């Protein structure tokens, strides 16, 4: 009932009721704000910050802040935000999605909520889909923010950590969405807490929110490292795939999955000389074969990817853009390289990963704006707890959205499009033709060339000319073929002459996987109350029908014809197929989230443990916990238990002495351990191990100082956690791939993944504790003075680098390591000498104890080393 009420125009959400009430308050304040001088208007920022610090809430000061923001925007940009833009801004501050049609001024709408949340001085992030938009919006809107005493920065992938840290310290940071996620992952790989660049996840406003949170939700962010692997198996798997006939495998068109049938399995057993392909020992080979099948029979060139400069470049299915720097994971990239006979790169090892869904859900407040999101509202509610609020247009929408025309086959559809373009172009009306695949755009390109129709093509292959092509698409006589216009950041503005002949004509050549994407294409026409027209030309050969509506059966029902098949039944088939694939894609995204939620809980525990180690000034409590966990695990190990009960004390004693006490004089005695009550054994071993560790630790502190020992302990703990965690997430990746194989045994893959993943994580915690404690007890640098000095110098070197002025820091890093060590070693001696003087309260001239920082007095003063 509630859902039906929301579809009635006069039904308003709670957010919209709040927004309208607040808008009235803003408008009531406007006369008084207009009379403020520039200085008085600017000083309002200081007043708002003070009031927030004194306890006022953002909600309480929202009307005043929005009124000030509106006036500042009017004075700086010479544009007074419309009431509907203020409504949109309030919705954004409420942590919801503002659905605003193309051309309604989303960028200006963002100013007020960003300004309001930046007043908390905790940092606000505005995320865009590409770097061009981030720089453009930061430059244009930054003028308003600067006027209001707010600092603005742009986060770029090319920046150094030092530069990024400064950018994140700004009141407002603009960034592409992927870089935010990568910065978060990198922050959780640092070995010094001061090297983190982000300062907390407070408030984020996502432009094109549906593109980021829906379309890209299935693509996890991954930081990878090189891992040696032979290209031979990819090539062999590809050779096998090329021997198969269509009857050897089965493709599920709906899910785009593929599997071998009995004849294919028999061929695999013969090809690889196996008795049973699906034996557990062959799981790695099955994974390679599965990727080869996907690469050869599912992944299509110029649809999912292109080959450019002998490299595989991925295509964003929703925007048509090349996804720079992206690659398929889990060996699929290498399988496609083998298919295309390209050089096969090493398969990478995952070092850190997170999905967009789980990353953005960590923000204290999340909001977004887009032209189309209402059709996906349930997903926004279920996953992000965000409602979608359509914002009224400033001027009525007068674009005409015509009925779809459906044709029997591709040839008939193309002929109809050609005829329509010829007819419409006679008046000079600009035409934008939207295709979903590069292959379609190039088909039309050839057809138009053959018929002498002057046109321009925009797809992933011409991505570099995008801005120029789009800027001309609204001019008289312009005919533009574009692959997936969704996500394009530049508005098409029809010229006066074009508006006089009907405005922009949007012609869709097929339905996409989402009504939302189709609505975005339509929305390119009729911006800001302009006249416009849209129409879709479809056929029974379109991918949507082939995958989800049984094209062959429909072709049997409807006789072949050159004219459009005007049938309500057919239109229902297209509509139902689109809803079906929307549901399938939602389930797919939900599955990705479910699997990532398992690793998310583990990741949060690992990252919190890491942070605890990085910030703690005393790590003994961590070390004690790890030693006790290790001892407890050893005593539960079956190799030390006798069949008739009790322990094999000989083995147990040898193992503990060998693992922890090699460098120590103290050793456990079998006779002593065997006389203890079993329940007291763990505590006794733990207490004695820690006692020995503390003796040596104190001796090292006396020699080298507590800071050096802390640095040494921290380094061992962090490096062990990182190494084992990285191995774990790669193990979890393989577990997920292999868990799909249990479907053959009628088991639930997700349940298998969850159960086995939990056991793996429990073991991971124990292994980290065991290896960390063993390294701390046995690391040679703790007992050899020369190596301990190296550890100490390494720690001081980083501390010294942090103190160097930024202008000189990079130069110091380029010096030879031995010279850096000598400089820092001398500085340590100098610090110790000064400390000695201060502690003895001596007043002697410090010059008398100053040593030469540069060790070699004979260095030429003009040399790099002297500098």
Curated annotation (Swiss-Prot):
Record-annotated membrane-spanning stretches: none
CDD domains: DEXDc_SecA, SF2_C_secA
Protein localization: Cell membrane; Cytoplasm
Membrane topology field: Peripheral membrane protein
Assigned EC number: 7.4.2.8
GO cellular component assignments: cell envelope Sec protein transport complex; cytosol; plasma membrane
Keyword ATP-binding included in the entry's annotation: yes
Protein name in UniProt: Protein translocase subunit SecA
Protein source organism: Mycoplasmopsis pulmonis (strain UAB CTIP)
């Amino acid at each position: 009932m509630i859902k039906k009420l929301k579809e009635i125009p006069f039904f308003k959400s709670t957010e919209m009721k709040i927004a309208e009430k607040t808008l009235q308050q803003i408008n009531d304040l406007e006369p008084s704000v207009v009379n403020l001088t520039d200085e008085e208007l600017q000083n309002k920022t200081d007043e708002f910050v003070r009031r927030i610090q004194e306890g006022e809430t953002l909600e309480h000061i929202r009307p005043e802040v929005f009124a000030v923001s509106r006036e500042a925007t009017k004075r700086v940009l010479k544009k007074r935000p419309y009431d509907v833009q203020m409504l949109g801004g309030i919705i954004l501050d409420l942590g919801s999605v503002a659905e605003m049609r193309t051309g309604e001024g989303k960028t200006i709408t963002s100013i007020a909520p960003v300004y309001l949340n930046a007043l908390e001085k905790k940092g606000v992030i505005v995320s865009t889909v590409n770097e061009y938009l981030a720089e453009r919006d930061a430059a244009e809107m930054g003028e308003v923010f600067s006027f209001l005493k707010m600092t603005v920065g742009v986060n770029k992938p090319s920046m150094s950590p030092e530069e990024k840290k400064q950018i994140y310290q700004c009141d407002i940071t603009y960034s592409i969405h992927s870089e935010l996620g990568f910065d978060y992952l990198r922050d959780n790989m640092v070995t010094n807490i001061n090297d983190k660049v982000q300062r907390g996840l407070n408030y984020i406003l996502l432009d094109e929110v549906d593109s980021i949170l829906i379309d890209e939700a299935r693509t996890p962010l991954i930081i990878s490292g090189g891992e040696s692997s032979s290209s031979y198996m990819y090539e062999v798997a590809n050779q096998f795939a090329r021997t198969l006939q269509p009857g050897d495998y089965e493709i599920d068109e709906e899910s785009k999955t593929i599997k071998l049938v009995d004849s294919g399995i028999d061929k695999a057993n013969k090809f690889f000389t196996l008795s049973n392909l699906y034996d557990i020992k062959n799981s790695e080979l099955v994974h390679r074969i599965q990727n080869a099948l996907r690469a050869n029979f599912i992944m299509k060139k110029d649809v999912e990817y292109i080959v450019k400069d002998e490299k595989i470049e991925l295509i964003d299915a929703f925007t048509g853009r090349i996804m720079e720097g992206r690659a398929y994971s889990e060996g699929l990239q290498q399988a496609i390289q083998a298919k295309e006979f390209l050089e096969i790169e090493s398969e990478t090892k995952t070092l850190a990963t997170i999905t967009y869904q789980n990353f953005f859900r960590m923000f204290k407040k999340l909001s977004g704006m887009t032209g189309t999101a209402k059709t996906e509202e349930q997903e926004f509610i279920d996953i992000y707890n965000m409602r979608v609020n359509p914002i009224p247009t400033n001027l009525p929408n007068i674009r005409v959205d015509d009925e779809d025309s459906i044709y029997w086959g591709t040839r008939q559809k193309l002929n109809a499009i050609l005829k329509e373009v010829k007819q419409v172009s006679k008046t000079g009306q600009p035409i934008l033709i939207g295709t979903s695949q590069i292959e379609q755009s190039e088909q039309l390109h050839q057809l138009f060339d053959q018929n002498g129709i002057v046109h321009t093509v925009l797809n992933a292959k011409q991505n570099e000319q995008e801005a120029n092509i789009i800027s001309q698409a609204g001019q008289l006589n312009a005919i533009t073929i574009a692959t997936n216009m969704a996500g394009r950041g530049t508005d098409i503005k029809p010229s006066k002459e074009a508006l006089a002949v009907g405005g922009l004509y949007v012609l869709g050549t097929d339905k996409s996987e989402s009504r939302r994407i189709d609505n975005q294409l339509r929305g390119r026409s009729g911006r800001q109350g302009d006249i416009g027209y849209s129409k879709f030309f479809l056929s029974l050969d379109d991918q949507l029908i082939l995958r989800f509506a049984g094209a062959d059966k429909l072709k049997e029902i409807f006789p072949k014809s050159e004219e459009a098949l005007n049938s309500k039944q057919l239109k229902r088939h297209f509509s139902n197929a689109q809803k079906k694939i929307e549901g399938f894609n939602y389930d797919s995204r939900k599955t990705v989230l479910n699997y990532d939620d398992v690793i998310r809980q583990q990741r949060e525990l690992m990252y919190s443990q890491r942070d605890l180690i990085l910030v703690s000034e005393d790590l003994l409590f961590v070390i004690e916990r790890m030693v006790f966990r290790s001892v407890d695990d050893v005593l539960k190990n079956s190799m030390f238990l006798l069949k008739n009960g009790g322990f094999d004390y000989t083995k147990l004693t040898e193992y503990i002495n060998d693992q922890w006490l090699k460098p120590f004089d103290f050793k456990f005695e079998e006779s002593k351990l065997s006389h203890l009550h079993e329940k007291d054994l763990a505590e006794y071993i733990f207490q004695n191990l820690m006692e020995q560790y503390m003796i040596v630790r104190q001796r090292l502190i006396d020699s080298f100082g507590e800071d050096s020992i802390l640095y040494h302990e921290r380094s061992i703990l962090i490096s062990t956690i990182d190494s084992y965690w990285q191995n774990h997430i790669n193990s979890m990746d393989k577990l997920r791939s292999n868990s799909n194989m249990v479907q053959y045994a009628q088991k639930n893959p997700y349940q298998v993944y969850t159960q086995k993943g939990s056991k793996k994580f429990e073991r991971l915690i124990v292994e980290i504790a065991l290896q960390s404690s063993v390294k701390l007890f046995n690391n040679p640098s703790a007992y050899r003075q020369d190596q301990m000095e190296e550890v100490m110098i390494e720690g001081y070197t980083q501390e010294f680098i942090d103190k160097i002025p930024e202008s000189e820091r990079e130069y110091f890093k380029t010096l030879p390591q031995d010279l850096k060590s000598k400089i820092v070693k001398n500085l340590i001696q100098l610090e110790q000498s000064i400390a000695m003087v201060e502690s003895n309260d001596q007043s002697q001239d410090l010059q008398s104890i100053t040593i030469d920082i540069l060790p070699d007095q004979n260095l030429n003063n003009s040399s790099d080393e002297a500098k």
